A protein has these predicted regions:
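Cytoplasmic-entry segments and transmembrane alpha-helices of multi-pass inner-membrane transporters
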Residues: 79-114
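Alpha-helical transmembrane segments of integral membrane proteins
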Residues: 58-59, 63-91, 139-305
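Hydrophobic alpha-helical segments of integral membrane proteins
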Residues: 10, 14, 24-40, 50, ...
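Hydrophobic alpha-helical membrane-insertion segments
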Residues: 102-124, 229-233
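An internal, D/E-rich "acidic patch" concept
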Residues: 21-77, 305
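Hydrophobic alpha-helical transmembrane segments of membrane transport/permease proteins
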Residues: 1-29, 118-157
Length: 305
């Protein structure tokens, strides 16, 4: 469970090595300096530097979550817009019912269902891993798609195709719930904008439905969705940690689960810090982007504070 000194001399050496003889403030300052220097300690199980292990595992999770987020935006926003434009119709009722049902499906159950159906029953898609073991792809960046492009003496087209096949089931498992949530959020935003006075004024001027939607409705409806996308990022990463274990995906989630099983507390601590830092950075980036495209929001917040 930790480093246990065998004698007094080893005890003193460990105290000096980790600056435990200093005050709490000095220890915390030393901790921050080592943290920003990339010295995150070593794994208690493998003995490898944690910075190297995290930098290999984290890009795999980012790649998986980014592909899932692409599916969420590609499917969720158009379906939400379509449902909102036909609010309270039979089509809207069908899409809304499917999205509510999909939102209630547990991600682990869905992932197991995909494995049983598309991998074991039909054999259409790979069961686990990021790529077939026959492809020797050196992990230069940690992002498999980029590493394939940088690799030498490899059939890049075949490797890229195989990597995409390995992505399908994990990505769909992660994106399923978030897509359902995005449909409902977009639908509600479209309905709210359609009831605004400036939309009624645009209709009275004789603008067509297509002109009203693309010039006035879409942009104003997407503005409230951007801050909520930060919440979807958290959901995607949380679901990715579960899905990675089921699909043996070598990401940070699977790595953290293994650290829990092996009681590798130093790896668990630094892994959670890396994930939380990533989520905070993405949230801040989305908020800054939202302020950039919607300056009125900053004025509104300055008035309400």
């Amino acid at each position: 469970t930790g480093i246990m000194p065998q004698n007094l001399m080893q005890h003193e050496a460990l105290m000096n090595q980790y600056h435990l003889n200093n005050s709490i403030i000095v220890q915390f300052a030393d901790y921050l300096s080592e943290l920003f220097a990339g010295n995150w300690g070593v794994s208690l199980i493998s003995g490898q530097p944690l910075s190297e292990e995290i930098m290999l595992a984290l890009p795999a999770t980012i790649e998986l979550s980014a592909c899932a987020m692409f599916i969420v935006i590609l499917v969720g926003i158009p379906l939400g817009c379509y449902s909102g434009l036909r609010a309270y119709s039979a089509t809207d009722f069908t899409i809304n019912s499917i999205s509510v049902t999909a939102y209630s499906v547990p991600v682990f159950w869905l992932a197991v269902l995909f494995i049983l159906t598309f991998s074991l029953q039909f054999g259409w898609l790979p069961l686990s891993g990021r790529i077939n073991l026959l492809f020797d792809i050196p992990p230069k960046t940690g992002f498999l798609m980029i590493d394939i492009l940088l690799a030498e003496n490899v059939d890049k087209a075949a490797a890229f195709s195989d990597a995409l096949l390995h992505l399908i089931l994990p990505v769909l498992s992660i994106a399923f719930i978030s897509t359902a949530s995005m449909i409902r959020i977009t639908r509600r935003s479209i309905i709210d904008v359609l009831n605004k006075p400036f939309i009624i004024a645009a209709r009275s001027k004789g603008l067509s439905s297509k002109q009203i939607f693309f010039r006035h409705v879409l942009r104003n409806a997407l503005l409230p969705i951007l801050p909520l996308m930060a919440m979807q990022i958290t959901t995607l990463i949380t679901n990715a940690m579960i899905v990675e274990t089921l699909f043996s995906w070598p990401g940070i989630g699977n790595w953290l689960i293994q650290a829990i099983y092996q009681r590798d507390y130093s790896a668990l601590r630094m892994g959670m810090l890396a994930v939380s830092t990533l989520v905070v950075m993405i949230t801040i980036a989305i908020d800054l982007f939202n302020r950039l495209i919607d300056p009125s929001r900053e004025k509104y917040e300055s008035v309400t504070i």
